[in-house]
Amino acid sequence: MTEKLSTETRGPLLEPLFASGWEMVEGRDAIKKTFVFDNFVDAFGWMTRVAIWAEKWNHHPEWDNVYKTVNVVLTTHDVGGLSTLDAKLARKMDSLAG
């Protein structure tokens, strides 16, 4: 079972994500990032590719899409905060966004 990030694992997993634009969500043990694409088709295509990985890993983002902008929040509800799954999905999102 996935566990909430410990103090020891939090820094090494999250610092590279912060360097790529991810931020902590105020008042929650969650991270967020806004992705902006050239147009709606690119944004929705990216969301579709992410959804395939999210389903494969059974870990789903909180997200919304307006035209070419996608706002993402990641947390693991089962553990009440951030887990390795969030870091893994964030890295995948970054790589798929190019």
UniProtKB/Swiss-Prot annotation:
GO terms for biological process: tetrahydrobiopterin biosynthetic process. It comes from the Bacteria. PANTHER family: PTERIN-4-ALPHA-CARBINOLAMINE DEHYDRATASE. Pfam families: Pterin_4a. It is an enzyme of class 4 (lyase). It catalyses: (4aS,6R)-4a-hydroxy-L-erythro-5,6,7,8-tetrahydrobiopterin = (6R)-L-erythro-6,7-dihydrobiopterin + H2O. The lineage of its organism: Bacteria, Pseudomonadati, Pseudomonadota, Alphaproteobacteria, Rhodobacterales. It comes from Roseobacter denitrificans (strain ATCC 33942 / OCh 114). GO terms for molecular function: 4-alpha-hydroxytetrahydrobiopterin dehydratase activity. CDD domains: PCD_DCoH_subfamily_b. Keywords: Lyase. InterPro entries: PCD_sf, Pterin_deHydtase. Its EC number is 4.2.1.96. This is Putative pterin-4-alpha-carbinolamine dehydratase. Belongs to the pterin-4-alpha-carbinolamine dehydratase family.
